[in-house]
């Protein structure tokens, strides 16, 4: 922590009851600092936590031409998930951009969608 602060970073501790960052508290703190946009880049657990909390407005998904499979294969989105396609989040205002061999899929999440409910 001291090294980060010495480098000019502001460090906040916002632990929730499970020891993880309390996401609404984080966003409230960012708002108080007049930060109104946040890029979340992380693994499946991080993506799932923000989606489950209904805190995602836009998705940028990078798709590489590689196929993974198997019951234990990693998923790009963790969290609660959905059992059936009808419960999946639907993205709107889609754009697709080719980046070399990869594809960038961008879309907006409807404001009323909340996976945890």
Model-derived segments and spans:
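Enzymes that bind and transform nitrogen-containing heteroaromatic metabolites
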Residues: 1-117
């Amino acid at each position: 922590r001291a090294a980060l602060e010495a480098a000019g970073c502001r460090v906040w501790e916002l632990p929730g009851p499970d020891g993880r960052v309390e996401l609404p508290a984080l966003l409230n703190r960012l708002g108080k600092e007049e930060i109104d946009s946040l890029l979340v880049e992380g693994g499946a657990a991080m993506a799932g936590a923000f989606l489950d909390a209904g805190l995602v407005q836009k998705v940028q998904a990078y798709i590489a031409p590689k196929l993974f499979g198997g019951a234990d294969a990693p998923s790009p989105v963790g969290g609660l998930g959905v059992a059936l396609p009808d419960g999946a989040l639907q993205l709107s205002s889609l754009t697709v951009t080719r980046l070399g061999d990869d594809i960038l899929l961008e879309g907006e999440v409807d404001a009323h969608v909340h996976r945890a409910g």
